[in-house]
Amino acid sequence: MVVERLQTNLDQQLELLESLKTVVAQEQQLLCSGRIQGIVLQGVTEQKSSILATLAYLDQTRLTTEKNINIQAPYSNVPALAERWQRILELAEGLRYGNLHNGLLLQQHIEHNTQALAVLNTRHGQSLYGPDGHAKGASLLGRKIGI
């Protein structure tokens, strides 16, 4: 039956939202650690993006199913669906706040790194490394002496 398909869809969305909650918590843990591990953070970000893409697909499927059977969230006439929908809304709201918090943490890291780079650039005047990533020939301490 079509209502059962909708119920399955909502159950799948709930599972994904729970997974996303775990991923957002991992992301927060990484952002709160003293030093961010870029590769680990990138993996978490990719995992988050994958879950969000699947959620978007499931939600589009939900909307199509709703249209086909002429029903609409919050499903007040179908208690089993209404309960799932309410849980989805609660999880989504919590995730919104978690994601906002993580965005603020990330912004703080970016600002800190920008300030650190500004200090390094003003103290040294020139970059220590050339475009190829190798150390430049000029010495910052004075003259070069060959032996």
Swiss-Prot record:
SUPFAM superfamilies: FlgN-like (SSF140566). It is found in: Cytoplasm. Required for the efficient initiation of filament assembly. InterPro entries: FlgN-like, FlgN-like_sf. Its main location: cytoplasm. The keyword Nucleus does not apply. This is Flagella synthesis protein FlgN. GO terms for cellular component: cytoplasm. The keyword Manganese does not apply. GO terms for biological process: bacterial-type flagellum assembly. It comes from Yersinia enterocolitica serotype O:8 / biotype 1B (strain NCTC 13174 / 8081). Belongs to the FlgN family. Keywords: Bacterial flagellum biogenesis, Cytoplasm.
